A protein has these predicted regions:
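An alpha-helical, amphipathic repeat domain used for nucleic-acid recognition
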Residues: 1-162
């Protein structure tokens, strides 16, 4: 076709467009962006150029992004603190940023791990048998709730009333 050029990503004007597409879908870490661009088949030099362009435009900022993701996890009320930490670290955020974001967001939201775990236990109704309790315990532990808390809710203190 005359008048149409196929984008190869090599033109200066096209640099950053792939990164912007990834970032438009959701908040991602710099490491997550690099991985997504690599999976798209871009060579290392192009990945670096895309990341630099995104940084220069101000749309790639791990400190801002990890805080947004931490806030969503806290508001989702489905994970314990360790589960939220694991999720953020697996997304490629640096440990120091994850710790700071979780600390700040948890304090701001006055989030309490016990109350979140109690909500989840109430929603599922604690099974009367040991096998059912063990299944519920595995679910809570897999979501990053503290083992002492799970033990207290399911065996020691009994199910929360509500």
């Amino acid at each position: 076709m005359v008048g149409r050029r196929r984008s190869t990503g090599a033109s200066v004007a096209g640099i950053g467009t792939r990164a912007l597409r990834v970032l438009a879908r959701r908040e991602v870490s710099e490491a997550g962006l690099r991985a997504a661009l690599g999976r798209a088949g871009l060579d290392q030099a192009t990945v670096e150029a895309e990341v630099e362009a995104a940084r220069a435009l101000g749309v790639l900022d791990d400190a801002r992004s990890v805080e947004v993701r931490a806030r969503r996890l806290v508001e989702g009320r489905a994970l314990g603190e360790a589960g939220m930490r694991r999720r953020l670290l697996e997304s490629g955020y640096p440990p120091a940023l994850v710790e700071r974001a979780l600390r700040d967001v948890i304090a701001e939201a006055q989030w309490d791990e016990r109350s979140v775990a109690e909500e989840l236990v109430r929603a599922r109704a604690v099974p009367p048998d040991a096998r059912g309790r063990a299944r519920l315990a595995r679910l809570l532990l897999s979501r990053g709730f503290q083992s002492e808390l799970v033990e207290d809710l399911l065996w020691k203190g009994g199910p929360p009333s509500g």
